[in-house]
Amino acid sequence: MSCIMQAKSAFLCVGGECFYNLIRAKKLAKLHCLGQNKIESYFSRIGVNAMNKNVALYNEMVDFFAGDARRCQHFIKVASLAKQLAESEGADAELTELVEAAGLVHDCGIKPGEAKYGAGHCTGKIQEQEGPSVARGLLQKVGYTPEKIERICYLVGHHHTYNMIDGLDYQLLVEADFMVNFYEDGMPKENIAKAVERIFKTGSGTKLVKTMFGL
């Protein structure tokens, strides 16, 4: 198979839209079949973002939580909802990408936390302590810039801290995580209403959660 054919076969089709598989691209580059610049140039010419970092990050997180369907389902939902809220709030593409990435990795501290303290004993604070170092390695692997890595790791290290929210990205991640947890935890409607009053600030998030849960 030619180098170009190998590169073409490295596509992932998600919802009818094709994205380039970054992990496969790196393997091709390491094999010196195609240089990384040539890979990017080829896919740029045919109108595909060759370096869709969040697709690669999604795959890394599925591998990270392999065998733990509950955790996989959770981060997928939080990331998707965070991205949707960002778009609804009119966030630019850069912030939307960052918020989605934060949603993907926000709970990566659970695995090392449970390894240290036992299953069911990984509190939100432990997640905040253990998560950033794991997230950093994954974000570096898929090609995020140091500046964005620092911000995403900050969000991972504070996503259970609600009195220090300092930006739209932080607020959107918290609201998305709360909405998913409301459902997954089977929280009573009156408790949801109190949490929404206390935590939710964005118009899109407030409207969605009230509509979704009939508040």
List where the protein language model places each region.
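Active-site flanking loop/helix segments enriched in acidic
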Residues: K53-K77, I110-H121
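An active-site-proximal "capping" alpha-helix that borders the catalytic cofactor pocket
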Residues: V78, K125-K141
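Serine residues within intrinsically disordered or low-complexity segments
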Residues: S2, S9, S41-S44
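His-Asp-centered metal-binding catalytic motifs of divalent-metal-dependent phosphohydrolases/nucleases
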Residues: T96-A119, G131, A135, C153-H160, ...
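Short, Lys/Arg-enriched N-terminal segments with co-localized hydrophobic residues
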Residues: K30-A50
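Divalent metal-dependent phosphate-bond-processing catalytic cores, especially two-metal-ion Mg2+/Mn2+ enzymes
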Residues: N52, A66-I76, S80-D92, V105, ...
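Ala/Thr-enriched low-complexity intrinsically disordered regions
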Residues: A7-A10, A25, A29
